[in-house]
UniProtKB/Swiss-Prot annotation:
Residues the record marks as site: Transition state stabilizer: K38, K251
EC number: 2.7.2.8
Subcellular location, principal: cytoplasm
A Gene Ontology cellular-component term: cytoplasm
Catalytic activity as recorded in UniProt: N-acetyl-L-glutamate + ATP = N-acetyl-L-glutamyl 5-phosphate + ADP
Cellular localisation: Cytoplasm
Pathway per the UniProt entry: Amino-acid biosynthesis; L-arginine biosynthesis; N(2)-acetyl-L-ornithine from L-glutamate: step 2/4
Any one GO molecular-function label of the UniProt entry: ATP binding
One GO-annotated biological process of the protein: L-arginine biosynthetic process
UniProt name for this protein: Acetylglutamate kinase
Function as written in the Swiss-Prot or TrEMBL entry: Catalyzes the ATP-dependent phosphorylation of N-acetyl-L-glutamate.
Xref: NCBIfam families: argB
Family per record: Belongs to the acetylglutamate kinase family. ArgB subfamily.
Length: 298
């Protein structure tokens, strides 16, 4: 071993010790607290990123947090619709979900994507349980109300008992965003919305949305204009003033709604960064945008 090798090892080990030391107060602060993670975007498609997200989720559980995962699966839904000769259609950013499409959405989200995530968490040493809204009436649906979009729903009610029971016993609930209304009709619900409503119902410490952007940017073309922290009032103003636009609007609105119902902090982070979850939760600087409820800004 050369002197350069020895120096590199010393520096690497020193960095690891510093990172662990920096994480300790956050681990102590958040022990026993619930963190709802919306898992989607590139972090679901890239196998290397997927492995790191799964390991992060298991790490959260191992150090005493109570992670709950809500996942999307749009690209895989589109892939299966294509295989079955059904053309994906969208209206105002929402997937038009007729009866045939709803069958595919449920098959893919509940039967494939959910079970893959569960298996990966279990392989990484966690204890995951797969659920959708229909299981134990975890959450029920109502029509979204927009004409011409079919079985696209909103969350009507959340029953937290099953989540509390699982999380308090060391299990990691993995939730797909399919639910039924009071007649038993299945609905496709936006996964961000489901994550926000579950976080609100549980009074979660954090709602974290893994996205394909750095967070909220003052200039969406310039990654260096990341806004690291805002409160709920400032977040609303960013929408009104046109700083937050396009697909970021429903994500920020989802965060604002959950904060207004008692979630302490919401985070929009870049899931393309390896170990994004741990970097956001357990480091002083973080990597994305944190939105705080007005009662917690001090």
């Amino acid at each position: 071993m050369t002197d350069n090798d020895s120096e590199y090892i010393r520096q690497t080990e020193a960095t690891r010790v510093r990172v662990l030391s920096e994480a300790l107060p956050y681990i102590q602060q958040f022990a026993g607290r619930t963190v709802v993670v919306k898992y989607g975007g590139a972090a679901m498609k890239d196998s290397t990123l997927k492995d790191k997200v799964i390991r992060d989720i298991v790490f959260l559980s191992c150090v005493g947090l109570r992670p709950i995962v809500v996942h999307g699966g749009g690209p895989e839904i589109n892939s299966w619709l294509d295989k079955l000769g059904i053309e994906p259609q969208f209206k105002n950013g929402l997937r038009v979900t007729d009866a045939a499409t709803m069958d595919v959405v449920e098959m893919v989200l509940v039967g494939r994507v959910n079970k893959e995530i569960v298996a990966l968490i279990n392989q990484a040493g966690g204890l995951a349980v797969g659920l959708c809204g229909k299981d134990g009436n975890l959450f029920t649906a109502r029509p979204q109300g927009q004409e011409g979009i079919g079985f696209v729903g909103e969350v009507s009610n959340v029953n937290i008992k099953i989540l509390d029971t699982l999380a308090s016993n060391g299990y990691i609930p993995v939730v797909s965003s399919v639910a039924a209304d009071e007649t038993g009709q299945a609905y496709n619900i936006n996964a961000d919305t489901v994550a926000g409503e579950i976080a609100a119902a549980l009074g979660a410490e954090k709602l974290i949305l893994l996205t394909d952007t750095s967070g909220i940017l003052k200039d969406y073309k310039d990654q260096s204009t990341l806004i690291p922290k805002v409160d709920i009032r400032e977040a609303r103003e960013l929408i009104v003033n046109g700083i937050v636009t396009g697909g970021m609007i429903p994500k920020v609105n989802c965060c604002v709604r959950s904060l207004a119902q008692g979630v302490r902090a919401a985070h929009i982070i870049d899931g393309r960064i390896p170990h994004a979850l741990l970097l956001e939760i357990f480091t002083d600087v973080g990597i994305g945008t944190m939105i705080l409820g007005s009662q917690f800004t001090s």
